[in-house]
Each structure stands twice: as structure tokens, then as C-alpha cells.
């Protein structure tokens, strides 16, 4: 859904999320949560630390927006606050990284801070236009999550483990079917694909 999302702002069509990724983490049973779907405590990865993928300078911080209820339509979400609590890091001229939907009150940086790869920016949450805890990440050509166009990016390396064949079943709490395929294995200098199950540096799925 990200790749085709377009925004008409100030008379200009923009595609800010063309290469965006929503990261979720499955538990050892390959489930998204364990417990009630609407309880944030059921999601073991809720509150996981979010690290900066690059060096750069913090140019935008939003915090204080409430958490949404998982499994339900977002309440009070607008185009202006769709990214929820978030941090934007200027990588270099014309390249900015967005880390969105952070946990309320969790941002660890301020505008003007210089960061290195691995710096903790905040904690994973469910704020803004979100119906389950996740990290929304993309690279864009300006500091605004709205008034920008997406830029392609790649990961240094990741381990492909297959694909989730039924995303709706995963989100609803059912056991997903992980389908191994020819893309399983080590990948370098590539971007992950839709519904692909990957691990980074032995961190798990």
C-alpha cells in the first residue's frame, strides 16, 4: 500500500512512501502477539529500542501523541499526525530518514543533535496512523514526512528467511505460513520485499 500512496499538497503530487517499510517482529512461535489483540502488552516487541540506521543530524522530533489501540482503526489520526511520534534524521544534503509511530514519551534525541549509526532515537510504539505496533521507516528528499518524495535505499546485509503468505492471518493472531523460496539466504546491498521475513545481524525475525 505504501508504494502507490500519493499526496496532493500545495498543488503538487508527492509520493513520500514509495520505498517505505513497516517493520514488525514475530515471536518464537511466528506470531505477532500473544494475548489479547487490543492489549499493547501482548506485543513483545512494543517498546523495543529504535536505533539510527545512519550518521546524521536530527532535524525533526514529534512526541506526545497517544498510543492507538491495536486491532482497531486509529482514533484522531489525520494527515498531519499520521507519522505519530517520530524522528527525522538528515543523512546528508537532500536525504532524510524518517522513524515513525514511536512510543509516547520515548524520544531520546532533540533537534540539532548529531547522531551516529546505532544511536537510540526512541522506542517502538503504536502512535499516529497505526493499528499494530511497528516501525515505519523510509528515506525522503526533505525533512517533511508529507512534503517530500521517497528515495530508494538498501541495507548493508540481511538474512532472507522466506515470505509470510497470509499477512491478514498474522495481524489477526493466527499462525502465519512462512514460505521459503529462492530468495532465502544472505543478501547484501538490497532492499527487502513486501511481506519478506528477514533477520539483521542475528537479531531474530
Spell out what each predicted region is.
Residues 1-43:
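Non-catalytic extracellular/periplasmic "stalk"
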Residues 44-45, 55-103:
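Zn2+-dependent peptidoglycan hydrolase active-site motif and core
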Residues 2, 11, 51, 77-81, ...:
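Acidic, glycine-rich catalytic/binding loops that coordinate metals and/or anionic ligands
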Residues 25, 60, 101-104, 126, ...:
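A residue-level detector for short acidic-glycine micro-motifs
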Residues 16-20, 45-47, 53, 82-84, ...:
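Extracytoplasmic
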Residues 56-58, 112-124:
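A structural signal for short beta-strand/turn segments enriched in small hydrophobics and glycine
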Residues 51, 95-118:
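Short histidine-centered loop motifs in beta-beta connectors
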Residues 62-78, 119-135, 144:
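Flexible, gly/ser-rich surface segments that form the specificity/activation loops bordering the active-site cleft
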Amino acid at each position: 500500500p505504501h508504494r502507490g500512496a500519493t499526496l496532493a499538497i500545495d498543488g503538487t503530487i508527492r509520493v513520500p512512501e514509495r520505498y517505505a517499510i513497516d517493520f514488525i517482529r514475530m515471536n518464537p512461535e511466528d506470531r505477532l502477539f500473544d494475548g489479547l489483540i487490543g492489549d499493547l502488552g501482548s506485543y513483545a516487541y512494543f517498546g523495543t529500542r529504535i536505533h539510527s540506521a545512519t550518521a546524521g543530524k536530527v532535524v525533526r522530533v514529534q512526541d506526545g501523541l497517544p498510543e492507538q489501540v491495536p486491532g482497531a482503526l486509529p482514533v484522531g489520526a489525520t494527515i498531519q499526525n499520521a507519522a505519530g511520534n517520530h524522528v527525522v534524521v538528515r543523512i546528508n544534503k537532500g536525504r532524510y530518514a524518517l522513524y515513525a509511530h514511536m512510543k509516547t514519551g520515548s524520544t531520546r534525541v532533540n533537534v540539532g543533535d548529531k547522531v551516529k549509526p546505532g544511536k537510540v532515537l526512541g522506542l517502538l510504539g503504536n502512535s499516529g496512523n497505526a493499528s499494530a505496533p511497528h516501525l515505519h521507516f523510509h528515506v525522503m528528499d526533505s525533512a517533511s514526512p508529507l512534503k517530500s518524495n521517497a528515495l530508494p535505499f538498501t541495507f548493508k546485509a540481511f538474512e532472507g528467511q522466506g515470505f509470510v503468505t497470509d499477512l491478514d492471518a498474522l495481524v489477526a493472531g493466527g499462525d502465519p505460513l512462512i514460505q521459503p523460496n529462492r530468495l532465502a539466504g544472505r543478501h547484501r546491498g538490497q532492499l527487502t520485499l513486501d511481506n519478506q521475513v528477514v533477520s539483521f545481524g542475528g537479531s531474530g525475525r
